[in-house]
């Protein structure tokens, strides 16, 4: 039997690609990507190119978005979505995943640039929420997850030259 967590992550990758593809009728405001990275670890460290700019160009024109999915944790539940205080092997399994997108944020942004960055992040947050919702619905309809739920989406940064949006989803396997 395959790990159902891998299936949930695969469904999430597919939905993120669908919502962030650059060649759709209404592409992402900040530019899209077909690349969704599956990452590991406690936190996501965007690759250096996300926050890199040419010395003569502070516009971030040459750095694209970095989109990812990460398994945050595995846990046990007696009544989803509440985590069991003592997780015996007989309890239902559950996972929490995170989807996120990181983009370049210039140090010397003008007020107009800051407004544009805010609108891009608003668009990113909507797309991640929709992608996670669609992936969780697919997981339930395919019988991979008994129950699902979305966590809150939250901004990160700007830190250095990076700004990001992160959101979690939970699935009872």
In which residue ranges do the predicted regions lie?
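Acidic-leaning, charged glycine-interspersed low-complexity segments
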Residues: 23-40, 117-172
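The N-terminal extracellular segments of secreted preproproteins, especially immediately downstream
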Residues: 59-62, 88, 103, 132
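General secretory precursor processing signal
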Residues: 63-66, 92, 136
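Short, solvent-exposed beta-strand/turn "edge" segments of beta-rich domains on protein surfaces
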Residues: 82-91, 156-160
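Short, solvent-exposed segments of well-ordered alpha helices
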Residues: 86, 90-93, 115, 119
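Oligomerization/assembly interface segments of phage tail-like spikes and tubes
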Residues: 91-107, 159-173
């Amino acid at each position: 039997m395959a790990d159902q967590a891998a299936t949930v992550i695969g469904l999430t990758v597919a939905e993120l690609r669908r919502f962030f593809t650059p060649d759709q009728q209404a592409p992402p405001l900040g530019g899209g990507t077909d690349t969704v990275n599956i990452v590991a670890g406690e936190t996501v460290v965007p690759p250096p190119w996300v926050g890199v700019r040419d010395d003569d160009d502070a516009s971030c024109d040459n750095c694209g978005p970095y989109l990812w999915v990460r398994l945050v944790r595995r846990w046990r539940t007696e009544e989803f979505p509440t985590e069991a205080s003592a997780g015996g092997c007989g309890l239902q399994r559950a996972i929490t995943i995170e989807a996120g997108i990181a983009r370049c944020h210039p140090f010397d942004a003008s007020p107009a640039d800051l407004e544009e960055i805010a609108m891009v992040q608003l668009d990113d947050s909507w797309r991640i929420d929709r992608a996670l919702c669609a992936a969780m619905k697919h997981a339930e309809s395919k019988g991979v997850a008994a129950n699902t739920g979305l966590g809150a989406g939250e901004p990160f940064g700007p830190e250095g030259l990076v700004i990001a949006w992160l959101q979690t989803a939970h699935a009872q396997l």
